[in-house]
Amino acid sequence: IKQYAGSIPEEKVIKVGMDICSALVLCESKHIVHRDIKPENIMVSEFGDYKLGDFGIARTMYHTTQATIAGSDRYMAPEVITRKEYGKEVDIYSLGLVLYWMLNNCKRPFIDADYIPSNEENEQAQLRRVTGDPLPPPKYGSRKLQNIVLKACAYEPKDRFSSAREMY
């Protein structure tokens, strides 16, 4: 989905969210954590379905937690960046950030949707996200969709959806 620029229709954001949630439901049933959900790893099929790709750093989680850094830090959950133990909630967070990006003119949290940030501003936005500043709502999307995205992107894993099935 990386080829998009500008405002993305809400229906498309919802379709991406539902299709990737379906992929994560399957991952969760197999105890797999993807760990690298980002726009570049979401492809569209010839039938218009969105697929999650690049399982190169995915890991199985059998009653254990991970504490290794893997994935793209732009979409990485705070607990991964800060090297805390984590579980499947990191995929919920990353999907939430992808949906946020789609609803915010392809800009990440703390970056104005109508502005091209400098590298320093991007770094400051990343720091604010990782240190727990509450995310502002994305610029576009219904209040209901914004609330779903913000819950998925909650700083504390316990405040996120507990599973992809719940988010779906």
Model-assigned labels for residue ranges:
Residues V16-G17:
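Activation segment signature within eukaryotic-like protein kinase domains
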